[in-house]
Structures are given as C-alpha cells and as structure tokens.
Amino acid sequence: MNFPLIANIVVFVVLLFALAQTRHKQWSLAKKVLVGLVMGVVFGLALHTIYGSDSQVLKDSVQWFNIVGNGYVQLLQMIVMPLVFASILSAVARLHNASQLGKISFLTIGTLLFTTLIAALVGVLVTNLFGLTAEGLVQGGAETARLNAIESNYVGKVSDLSVPQLVLSFIPKNPFADLTGANPTSIISVVIFAAFLGVAALKLLKDDAPKGERVLAAIDTLQSWVMKLVRLVMQLTPYGVLALMTKVVAGSNLQDIIKLGSFVVASYLGLLIMFAVHGILLGINGVSPLKYFRKVWPVLTFAFTSRSSAASIPLNVEAQTRRLGVPESIASFAASFGATIGQNGCAGLYPAMLAVMVAPTVGINPLDPMWIATLVGIVTVSSAGVAGVGGGATFAALIVLPAMGLPVTLVALLISVEPLIDMGRTALNVSGSMTAGTLTSQWLKQTDKAILDSEDDAELAHH
C-alpha cells in the first residue's frame, strides 16, 4: 500500500465521520444531503488538483470511495422493487372501485409521454440553436474501448426490440423474475403484476369480506414495513452523495468538459426550458409553479446527486402525498411509471439531442420537418422502456439512434461528460413524474388543497 492512497482513504473516512455528526442536529435530510454534496465537491476538487484526473493513486482511491458511493446506489436498487411492488399493491387495494385504476394510469402515462414529446422537441431545438454536430469529435482509443463495452452491455438487450416487442415486454410472464429486475422493463412488469394482485384483492373483498379484510390488512402491513426499510436506506443518503460527488468531481477531465462545453451548456439550457414547461403545465391547471418547485426541491436535489430516478421513488411519493396533496394511489403510480415510462431528461431530451448531432455526419439535414417528426415519434414511443437506474440515457440513445438509422459512436464520445449532465437529467425525470402525478390528481379533483396550500412543509422522511 502506498502512502498517498492511505492518506486519501483516511481523509475520506474522517469526512464520513464529520458528516455523521450531523445526525445529532435537528437538520432535514435535504440539508444533510447538501452538506454531503458540498463536502464531496470540495474533497473531489482537492484530489483533482493534487493528483490530476488520470493518476493511478486517484483511480485506486476512487475504488475505495466506491464502497460507499456505489454501495449506497446498490442499496437503493435493492429497495426499488419491493417499494414499487408494495406501493402499487397498496395503492390499488385502497381504490374503492377498479375503474379508477384505468383513469389514473391513462392520465399519468399520457402526461408522461406528452412531456417527453415536448422534451424531444426542446432537444432538437437547443441542439440546432447551438449548431452542435458530432463532426470534429475525435474518437480516440479510450472511446473505442468504451463503445465496445457499451455495445456488449446493452445492445443485445435493445437493438432487436421493435415497438410491438417493446410493448409486449412490459407484460409480465414471470413476475418473480421481474422482481429480480432481470429485464430493462422489469419495473413496469412489476407495476402491472402488483396492479393485478390489487384488483384481485378488491374482488376478494367483495366476494368474501373476512378473507378480503385479512388480505388488505396484510397489504397495509407490507407497505408500512417496506416504507421502514426505505427510511433506513434513506438515512445513508448524505454519505452516498459525499462519495458519489467526490468521484464525479475528482475523476472528471476538465479538458473533456471544456471541449464538450457547448454540449453541456446546451443540455442544461434544454433542461431549464423543460422545467419551465413543467411549471407552465402546472400553472395552467391551478398549481402555482413557484410553490411546486419550493415543495419538491429536496427531491430534485436528491435526484440530482444520486443520478437514479428509480432510487428517488421513495422521496418522490413522500413529496407528492405530504407536500403536494396528491393521494397515495396517484402518487405511487406516477412515481413508479415515471421511473420507466417517459423520462423527460434521459429518454426525451438526451436521445433527441444526440440524433440531431449525429445526423449531419451521415448526410441528413437535422432541420427537415419530416425527419424531426419521425425522431420525436420514435423518442416518445421508445421512452417507454428506459430503466430508471443510472445509465438509462445511454440505453435510450441506443434504442433511438439505430431506429433512426444512425451510428451509435457518439454515445461513447460523450461519456466523459455523462455524469455531469446525467445529474440534471435525472432531476428533470423526477420532476416530470411528480408533475404527472400532480396534474392527474388535479384533473380527477382528488388533490388535498389544505396540504397543497399550506406554507409549512411536512418534513420528508428521515427518521
């Protein structure tokens, strides 16, 4: 073991201990996460300045930090399936009639796809506005290696899925395999399976009340139990964020970021426009955008740092029910669907931007209205199966680009700035699903106005 490596690990452990002292304070989770975020950025910058992003010491150190960072993300992935299963099951079992189920899913999914369609258009717009193209981005050895890795990872799962097959892959044939997250579309399959189970519980309640009551009591117990598990993992968020931010900041190559600067700026401009679109949609439907963003801010910061839409599901549901007055049934649906269907950032904005950048290299005019219409259509439809765990955007791009007959090499070239942009995209995905839930709740006139209008915001889960 070399000395610098040990020193880095010691400093990291000291930072974790320092962060652990915040548990004695009456701080909200959002505040602790913010402290972790700042510490991670500062520590990451220090490491970057001392060692430079390519040094072996730094790479070795990051592997140790990953125990905390990636370990945390894996714990989040651990709770996603039980959470989606329990939330949807209890949400459906609480509906008094199964006909509401159709309405809720139709409106939620409709809103998600509609916002993704707008996001794709915004992506086309900003990319053309900045005149970004893939020409002149050099493919070095590192990129080629990355491309091969990406292709072997994803392409087998994606490229042979046509749209009908994609839709078919949502329907669960082995719910236990889907609970293991075996397929990219597992989350949706679990949602469908849980919804069926919930409807069956309602039918049972009608036909045989005592048994039905017992099943519903069991479902409620399961839901409370899983939520306790979720809170446990949530308490680790600040530490995970500290480690993840250290890794992103220390390992990001400044030359790459400057070289791809216009892409980063264009991406964030597109993201800001989409946040404005969410605000406008809410405003039209009687929810003050400022109030909405103030109330969901902790969830967005969490999504931003964790870079996982699926991992944000627990906080997402909490914010909708306890701050925006959305009933639990709608909130659980919007959060679970939103982690897979119609992610505005990862599956809407990003693939559209990439397609517009690649088009000129193969002699397609990216301003051609027919081409744009086809692109937006394909992006919207294929956004239905992007798994909500980090790297979903790469996945979306690998569905959209081949479908448009475009090469996928650009995906590898942009990977160096991927984490930087992915943070903003994930926040947008999560805002999209909360917007869908809030709008659905408004349309069905089920919003609890007292909660929505209250100025003091319920503290989001952290005990």
Curated annotation (Swiss-Prot):
Main location group: membrane
Regulation: Inhibited by L-cystine and L-cysteine, and to a lesser extent by D-cystine.
Key words, A-Z: Amino-acid transport, Cell inner membrane, Cell membrane, Membrane, Symport, Transmembrane, Transmembrane helix, Transport
One Gene Ontology term of the molecular function aspect: sulfur amino acid transmembrane transporter activity
Spans traversing the lipid bilayer: 1-21, 33-53, 73-93, 106-126, 185-205, 264-284, 347-367, 370-390, 395-415
Induction of the gene: Transcription is controlled by CysB. Highly expressed in sulfate medium and repressed in cystine medium.
UniProt record, GO biological process: L-cystine transport; sulfur amino acid transport; sulfur utilization
Disruption phenotype: Disruption of the gene decreases uptake of cystine. The mutant cannot grow on S-sulfocysteine. The tcyP-tcyJ double mutant is unable to import cystine. The tcyP-tcyL double mutant cannot grow in the minimal medium containing L-cystine as a sole sulfur source. The tcyP-tcyJ and tcyP-tcyL double mutants are completely resistant to both L-selenaproline and L-selenocystine.
Record's keyword annotation contains Metal-binding: no
Gene3D superfamilies: Sodium:dicarboxylate symporter
Pfam families in alphabetical order: SDF
Protein localization: Cell inner membrane
InterPro entries given in the database record: Na-dicarboxylate_symporter, Na:dicarbo_symporter_sf
Membrane-related topology note: Multi-pass membrane protein
Entry annotated with the keyword Transport: yes
Catalysed reactions, as listed in the record: L-cystine(out) + H(+)(out) = L-cystine(in) + H(+)(in)
Listed GO CC annotations: plasma membrane
Function text: Involved in L-cystine import. Low affinity L-cystine transporter that is mainly involved in L-cystine uptake from outside as a nutrient. Is the primary transporter at high concentrations of cystine. Probably functions as a proton symporter. Can also transport D-cystine, cysteine and homocystine as a methionine precursor. Mediates accumulation of the toxic compounds L-selenaproline (SCA) and L-selenocystine (SeCys). Can also transport S-sulfocysteine and is required for growth on S-sulfocysteine as a sulfur source.
Similarity annotation: Belongs to the dicarboxylate/amino acid:cation symporter (DAACS) (TC 2.A.23) family.
Protein name: L-cystine transporter TcyP
Organism: Escherichia coli (strain K12)
